[in-house]
């Protein structure tokens, strides 16, 4: 897979959706596309199989995603036509990143020892959103190895306030003292 190629197609799709005022619909459709590709690895196998012709792939995509907006379907078809079907897998992620960036939204993960309530999750989103100057959409991941505290990852930035990290820092300070 060539990420830069997938990003180019994502940018073209994003630009068209923005111009046409269909960002919400395109966002929903690429989320669905992502879910379908995750749920059916056989589809990805077909898209990357050199024995399957471009016309067969195009028909498969029309049959599978023909109810989506024309710009989404046409983007998929152009990718197949240009022998870029393998990049279809990455398209939804890059489109969502562009849409989120345009809207000032960042997605991330908050790791905790136990599931956070909806209220606690919103509080974490607000606090870290203010630090980053963005609206955050965090997904809570439970990691039983986290004794307590939180680890928040947004993009390439990690805020680690777990007890494990605090103990590690304390140990280093004591050893260096």
Swiss-Prot record:
Keywords: ATP synthesis, Cell membrane, CF(1), Hydrogen ion transport, Ion transport, Membrane, Transport. It holds the Pfam family OSCP. Its main location: membrane. Coiled coil: none annotated. One of its GO terms (molecular function) is proton-transporting ATP synthase activity, rotational mechanism. GO terms for cellular component: plasma membrane; proton-transporting ATP synthase complex. The keyword Cell membrane applies. It is a peripheral membrane protein. It is found in: Cell membrane. The keyword Lipid biosynthesis does not apply. InterPro entries: ATP_synth_OSCP/delta_N_sf, ATPase_OSCP/d_CS, ATPase_OSCP/dsu. F-type ATPases have 2 components, F(1) - the catalytic core - and F(0) - the membrane proton channel. F(1) has five subunits: alpha(3), beta(3), gamma(1), delta(1), epsilon(1). F(0) has three main subunits: a(1), b(2) and c(10-14). The alpha and beta chains form an alternating ring which encloses part of the gamma chain. F(1) is attached to F(0) by a central stalk formed by the gamma and epsilon chains, while a peripheral stalk is formed by the delta and b chains. Belongs to the ATPase delta chain family. PANTHER family: ATP SYNTHASE DELTA CHAIN. This is ATP synthase subunit delta. It comes from Exiguobacterium sp. (strain ATCC BAA-1283 / AT1b). The lineage of its organism: Bacteria, Bacillati, Bacillota, Bacilli, Bacillales. The gene is atpH.
